[in-house]
């Protein structure tokens, strides 16, 4: 019995082309294309072209069993053609071939739908002043960077609750909607900030120093502040002529969260106390003593001062 070869559909193999989309971009049938080799084109009947195959493709979710069986539908029996698909990888398969004269086999390719970039808005400053409390740094996803009806939040915000003085990086990590990624295709968004020392509560002292003593021996009164007071130059020795001169004093708080501050402090110079004693002297009756000598019995001279610098005269007030 003769066989009518025209009743047997001709088998033609084509290759689906891989494609890439971003989440939110519409996928149309025109986006899904294929290639056919010259050897396969030769199998076309006279007068037919590639368009004569009436071939359309579809993109569907990847299920291993579907690929092996050649199914052209997803798990629910639907495809995503013309709809928003979640970010991920899809397989491009045969949808329909309207020309029954051909048995069209489509070698599948992948459609990669990449995540859409979401913009982050920081409610934060670059610098803060120490208060002992967290700075209140927040990070949110800009609503206008999302598709309509989509919602997306930051999964975790780390290192934003610092309270001590220092330089830090707040980290926004991950997004609750897997279809989105931080701008720049990053997994983490960073905000750099620093907490600066605060002004301390301090009252600088009243200072007195005895003539000839260095500021190291100065007496301070009336100071307040949880820290250390010191002169910028505590070796300075002031003279009476410099009474009430301004000297730079530095206050360093014990708590490093507060600033070290300086102030010009007036210094009162007090006279140096000395006790002198006239030397014992004897004379014969009728003899005149023109100069009486003396010595320091209590106290000492300052620096390079000499006895004659004191310009003290001792006189006899009674006796012959």
Please report, for each region that a protein language model flagged, where it lies by residue.
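Solvent-exposed beta-strand/loop surfaces, strongest in extracytoplasmic domains of secreted
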Residues: 1-320
């Amino acid at each position: 019995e003769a066989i009518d070869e025209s009743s047997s559909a001709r088998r033609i193999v084509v290759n689906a082309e891989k494609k890439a989309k971003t989440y939110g971009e519409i996928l149309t049938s025109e986006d899904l294309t294929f290639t056919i080799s010259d050897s396969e084109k030769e199998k076309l009947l006279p007068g037919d072209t590639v368009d004569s195959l009436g071939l359309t493709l579809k993109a569907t979710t990847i299920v291993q069993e579907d690929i092996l069986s050649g199914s052209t539908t997803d798990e629910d029996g639907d495809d995503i053609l013309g709809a928003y698909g979640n970010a991920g990888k899809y397989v491009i398969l045969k949808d329909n071939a309207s020309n029954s004269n051909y048995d069209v086999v489509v070698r599948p390719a992948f459609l990669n739908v990449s995540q859409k970039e979401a913009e982050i808005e920081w409610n934060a400053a670059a610098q803060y002043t120490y208060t002992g409390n967290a700075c209140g740094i927040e990070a949110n996803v800009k609503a206008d960077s999302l598709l309509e009806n989509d919602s997306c939040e930051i999964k975790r915000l780390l290192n934003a609750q610092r309270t001590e003085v220092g330089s830090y990086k707040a980290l926004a990590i991950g997004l609750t909607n897997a279809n989105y990624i931080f701008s720049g295709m990053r997994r983490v968004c960073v905000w750099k900030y620093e907490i600066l020392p605060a002004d301390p509560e301090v009252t600088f002292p009243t200072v007195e120093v005895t003539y000839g003593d260095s500021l190291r021996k100065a007496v301070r009164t009336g100071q307040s502040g949880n820290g250390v007071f010191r002169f910028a130059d505590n070796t300075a020795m002031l003279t009476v002529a410099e009474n009430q001169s301004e000297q730079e004093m530095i206050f360093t708080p014990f708590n490093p969260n507060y600033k070290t501050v300086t102030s010009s402090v007036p210094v009162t110079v007090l006279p140096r106390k000395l006790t002198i004693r006239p030397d014992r002297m004897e004379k014969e009756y009728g003899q005149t003593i023109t100069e009486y000598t003396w010595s320091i019995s209590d106290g000492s001279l300052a620096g390079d001062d000499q006895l004659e610098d004191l310009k003290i005269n001792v006189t006899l007030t009674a006796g012959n």
